[in-house]
């Protein structure tokens, strides 16, 4: 990544289904992005960039899809569903503001 592209790494999550790291970046809309890396930290792909859809801190991984929770400082945030096969995005539930943290326990998920 070029110097000066982003100021903040919001979170780094390990995807145990694919053995990859998902890195969530963003301070401003233009700095927001999700990039996937392998275990050697080589960039595999950019899921999306330059939109608050790709500014998140919390995410949950499943076999066929990935969910993340937008952290939009300027408006409403949504659950975003990424389909692994088609690479399509789908907006889900709308939150009244940014989502900061989530955790899972015994296949239950909490925001």
Language-model features and meaning:
Residues 18-23, 64-67, 108-111:
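Entry beta-strands of beta-propeller and related beta-repeat scaffolds
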Residues 1, 9, 31-32:
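Short N-terminal edge-element motif at the start of the domain
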Residues 17-18, 28-29, 39-41, 64, ...:
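Short strand-connecting beta-turns/loops that link adjacent beta-strands
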Residues 29-36, 74-82:
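Structural motif
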Residues 23-27, 69-72:
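Recurrent small/Gly-Pro-centered beta-turn motifs in extracellular repeat architectures
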Residues 19, 29-32, 51-54:
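Beta-propeller domains
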Residues 1-2, 39-53, 81-100:
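Trp- and S/T/G-rich repeat-edge/linker motifs of beta-rich repeat architectures
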Residues 6-11, 51-63, 93-109:
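Repeated scaffold domains used in trafficking and secretory/extracellular systems
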